[in-house]
């Protein structure tokens, strides 16, 4: 099924918003590993929407992260803190999904959730 770029961007941003809502619910229910996963994916969907807008499409998470840092963080289109957040969220998701005996504290997850919300707002403005 072929869809136009605008529709796909809107869809990815909708996924981003829904995934952030899932992160909030997970955190409220002390499912902190799940919250970490959903925080990362909320950012990932937003950056993938930005990639689509800029004709950069990849299925590789690391490539998307590198592209974002090169084109938006280093060029100062977004604040460095957002690049750090996205990288940290990626690492946090990796740890929560693949490592054993990983734990996150509620404060850390709440802080990342707040940053994710700000990050998604910033990405929306770039679209």
Residue ranges and their predicted role:
Residues 1-127:
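Terminal alpha-helical segments
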């Amino acid at each position: 099924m072929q869809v136009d770029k605008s529709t796909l961007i809107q869809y990815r941003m909708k996924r981003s918003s829904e995934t952030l809502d899932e992160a909030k619910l997970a955190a409220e229910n002390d499912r902190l590993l799940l919250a970490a996963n959903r925080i990362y994916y909320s950012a990932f969907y937003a950056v993938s929407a930005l990639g689509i807008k800029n004709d950069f499409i990849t299925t590789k998470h690391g490539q998307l992260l590198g592209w974002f840092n090169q084109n938006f963080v280093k060029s100062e289109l977004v604040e460095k803190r957002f690049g750090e957040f996205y990288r940290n969220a990626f690492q946090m998701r990796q740890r929560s999904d693949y490592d054993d005996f990983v734990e996150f504290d509620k404060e850390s997850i709440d802080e990342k959730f707040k940053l994710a919300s700000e990050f998604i707002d910033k990405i929306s403005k770039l679209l």
